[in-house]
Amino acid sequence: MTCCQTSFCGYPSFSISGTCGSSCCQPSCCETSCCQPRSCQTSFCGFPSFSTSGTCSSSCCQPSCCETSCCQPSCCETSCCQPSCCQISSCGTGCGIGGGISYGQEGSSGAVSTRIRWCRPDSRVEGTYLPPCCVVSCTPPSCCQLHHAQASCCRPSYCGQSCCRPVCCCEPTC
C-alpha cells in the first residue's frame, strides 16, 4: 500500500488500490479498515464525511475507521494515533479559530507542537446550517469548538450526548 502525506479534513485516509489518490495518509496512519471510499452517508468516528463539492468523493469514510489508528476528535470513544500523523490538511479556506496551520516551538521545554486543522461537518450532511469550517488546534478540539457552540452539536452523531438540549452544549448544564 502506498500512502501520501496528505489527509482529508484532518482525518487520514488511504488508497485501497495501492496508489495515491486525492486523500492519502502517512504509512503510520494506514490500517486496512481505515477510511473505505464510496459512501457519504456514513460517518467517521461520529462525524459526517466531508466533501468540498457536496458530493461523494474517494475520501468518504466509514465508521470502521474509528476502530483502528486514525486521527480523530477527542469526542470519539476510541484512542487513536498522535496528531502528528495528520500534519497536512485539505480542510478548505475558512477557519473558525486561528489563522492557519503553523509548526514551531512552544512552551519552555522547547517541544515541537503541531497545529492541525480539524473539520466540522458540512451543513448539507447534518443540517447544522453552519458552513464547512476548520478549527486550528494543537489538540483535538471540543464539540463546541467545532460547531461554534451551537446546540446542534449536542446531537448524538457529534459528541455522544444522549439527547439534544435547547441550550448550548458548552454550558455547564449540558
Curated annotation (Swiss-Prot):
Keywords: Keratin, Repeat. Expressed in the middle/upper portions of the hair cortex, in the region termed the keratogenous zone. Transmembrane segments: none annotated. Residues 3-172 are annotated as: 15 X 5 AA repeats of C-C-[QEPVRC]-[TPIVLE]-[SRHVP]. One of its GO terms (cellular component) is keratin filament. Belongs to the KRTAP type 1 family. In the hair cortex, hair keratin intermediate filaments are embedded in an interfilamentous matrix, consisting of hair keratin-associated proteins (KRTAP), which are essential for the formation of a rigid and resistant hair shaft through their extensive disulfide bond cross-linking with abundant cysteine residues of hair keratins. The matrix proteins include the high-sulfur and high-glycine-tyrosine keratins. Interacts with hair keratins. This is Keratin-associated protein 1-5. It comes from Homo sapiens (Human).
